[in-house]
């Protein structure tokens, strides 16, 4: 039985005593309330003012929203003659929906920002039915002065966590809020009942989705002779062809790429290079739609096993660092193409080292040769770029690298294609392109001249290569006078590296500016190494992130002091720390 202060006056006196002394007599309030007050105090929540951030627009297209919608409507109808609001939040306390029949009471809730898009997590709102339920993982009933923030003292709220039926992970909270003077234990019972109803609906929806996914998987398995892979929530289905063709490491990388496609609304096909040296083309064959969601997908997977090539040591091409089999396989394939004078497309993400790979291979095989690298940005006009390409490919045994052909302006594609047609069968051209290219003209006019495509893996897919890449780049930047300690290397290995090796070089350049010699610790890494977000920040966001990280370091990690030093509110710094993935 949850114990509360016997009267509103008791709770008010207890709160005032806690705020003035930081301590309370035993049993002055329920232990769950006291623990929450202590957390709120440590989080520097203002005890007298509501300082809630507008976090983001709620995502209404989620399983939680679809499962909760009819429950919220039914409860709102049942309570239509009462001043009670039904509130649904996400797992981070963001208010997703609010339903209330009493318009006057809705204005009261607006005044304290218990509204869509605002967060009622404890770190912002202190002790309350939503945030405390999320923090403890248990239902919470907070009445009147049991709220840490005095402005909320006129309310009572009963919150019950909503859990994913299979994993039991908290998805959000269902909360019933009324005026404190109208608080009734029945509110607590209703909130828990509503939470159970929503979980039941989630379970039913999961069953429907899983059944639909299984049906689609079986249908595609009958129709498609190659690999079939299905992903939906926590369910992964893989046919025998893939289980036999790919080992555990290959399957892990395949699932990583397929999961990215599942989340993407812009592309439905990708090519992945696997640790074994095989490559796979992954294509979305069928998206499963239950309700209005389509986060379950069945893929066709075609596996291309590389021809047997003896695995050489990592010193085979001295300029290249990396022990991962996927990267070494890429290097060996480019080398073979160069030795056989077969034109090759080297594709990969920006900054992954595509041009450098081609250049290093040529330098290794023919060290006496100087190979030109042509990039449109290095020329004043498109015409001068085309002229340089024509000149560099004029000899009988030419070799040239054209960087970022997917960025070439349309007006150079036809003349480039005409030149390549006259050069076919002699010399060697390597063209680099992005795996995310969106240029139909390049695909139509340029790529048909190339007989091979080699994919350079993203740095996050060969993170073990940091053990060679970091010392190599550091040695170059510091002339052999600096090295990373173990903690710094572990922090680098945690990062997603959306900018790949180019980003790594930038990070190490900034690091060497701070410490030019000796053993470099984690504290010398630049601010971006504290951010684990996979998206690439805009220049302005990167500046904000760096300023926040510096302030946190200068204030020993105290978020409130860091916010004050930056002249921003505590709510703002919490939101930006989360947005930027600052660890």
Curated annotation (Swiss-Prot):
ATP binds at residues 349-356, 395-404. Gene3D superfamilies: 1.10.8.60, 3.30.450.40, Homeodomain-like, P-loop containing nucleotide triphosphate hydrolases. One of its GO terms (molecular function) is ATP binding. This is Propane 2-monooxygenase operon transcriptional activator MimR. PROSITE patterns: SIGMA54_INTERACT_4. Acts as a transcriptional activator of the mimABCD operon encoding the propane 2-monooxygenase complex. GO terms for biological process: regulation of DNA-templated transcription. The gene is mimR. Keywords: Activator, ATP-binding, DNA-binding, Nucleotide-binding, Transcription, Transcription regulation. Pfam families: HTH_8 (PF02954). Disruption phenotype: Cells lacking this gene are unable to express the mimABCD operon. It comes from Mycolicibacterium smegmatis (strain ATCC 700084 / mc(2)155) (Mycobacterium smegmatis).
């Amino acid at each position: 039985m949850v114990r509360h202060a016997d009267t509103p006056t008791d709770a008010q006196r207890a709160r005032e005593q806690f705020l003035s002394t930081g301590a309370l007599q035993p049993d002055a309030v329920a232990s769950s309330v006291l623990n929450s007050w202590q957390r709120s105090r440590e989080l520097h929540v203002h005890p007298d003012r509501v300082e809630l951030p507008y976090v983001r627009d709620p995502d209404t297209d989620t399983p939680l929203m679809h499962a909760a919608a009819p429950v919220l409507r039914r409860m709102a109808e049942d309570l239509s003659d009462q001043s009670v609001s039904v509130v649904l939040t996400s797992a981070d306390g963001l208010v997703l929906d609010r339903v209330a029949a009493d318009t006057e009471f809705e204005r009261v809730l607006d005044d304290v920002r218990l509204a869509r898009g605002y967060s009622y997590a404890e770190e912002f709102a202190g002790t309350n039915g939503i945030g405390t339920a999320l923090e403890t993982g248990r239902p919470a009933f907070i009445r009147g002065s049991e709220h840490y923030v005095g402005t909320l003292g006129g309310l009572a709220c009963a919150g019950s966590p909503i859990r994913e039926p299979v994993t039991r992970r908290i998805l959000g909270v269902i909360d019933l809020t009324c005026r404190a003077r109208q608080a009734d234990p029945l509110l607590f019972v209703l909130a828990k009942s509503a939470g159970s109803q929503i979980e039941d609906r989630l379970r039913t929806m999961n069953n429907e989705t899983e059944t639909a996914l299984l049906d689609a998987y079986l249908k595609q398995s009958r129709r498609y002779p190659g690999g079939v892979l299905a992903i939906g929530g926590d369910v992964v289905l893989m046919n025998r062809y893939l289980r036999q063709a790919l080992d555990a490491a290959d399957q892990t990388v395949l699932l990583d790429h397929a999961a990215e496609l599942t989340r993407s609304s812009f592309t439905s096909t990708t090519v992945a290079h696997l640790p074994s040296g095989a490559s796979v083309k992954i294509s979305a064959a069928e998206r499963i739609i239950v309700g209005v969601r389509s986060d379950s997908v069945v893929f066709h997977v075609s596996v291309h096993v590389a021809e047997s090539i003896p695995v050489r040591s990592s010193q085979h091409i001295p300029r290249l660092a990396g022990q991962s089999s996927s990267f070494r396989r890429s290097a060996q394939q480019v080398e073979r193409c160069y030795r056989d004078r077969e034109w090759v497309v080297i594709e990969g993400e920006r900054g992954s080292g595509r041009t450098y790979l081609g250049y290093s291979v040529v330098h290794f095989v023919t060290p006496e040769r100087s190979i030109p690298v042509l990039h449109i940005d290095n020329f004043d006009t498109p015409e001068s770029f085309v002229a340089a390409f024509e000149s560099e490919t004029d000899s009988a045994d030419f070799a040239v690298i054209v960087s970022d052909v997917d960025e070439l302006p349309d007006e150079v594609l036809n003349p480039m294609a005409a030149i390549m047609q006259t050069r076919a069968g002699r010399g060697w051209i390597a063209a680099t392109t992005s795996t995310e290219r969106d240029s139909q003209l390049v695909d139509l006019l340029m790529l048909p001249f190339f007989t091979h495509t080699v994919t350079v893996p993203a740095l996050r897919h060969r993170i073990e290569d940091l053990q060679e890449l970091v010392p190599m780049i550091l040695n170059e930047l510091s002339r052999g006078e600096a090295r990373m300690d173990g903690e710094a290397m572990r922090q680098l290995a945690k990062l997603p590296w959306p900018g790949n090796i180019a980003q790594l070089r930038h990070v190490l350049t900034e690091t060497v500016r701070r410490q030019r010699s000796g053993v470099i610790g984690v504290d010398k890494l630049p601010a971006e190494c504290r951010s684990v977000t996979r998206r690439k920040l805009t220049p302005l966001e990167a500046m904000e992130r760096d300023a926040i990280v510096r302030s946190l370091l200068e204030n020993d990690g105290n978020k409130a002091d860091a916010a004050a030093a930056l002249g921003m509110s505590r709510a703002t710094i919490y939101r930006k720390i989360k947005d930027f993935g600052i660890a």
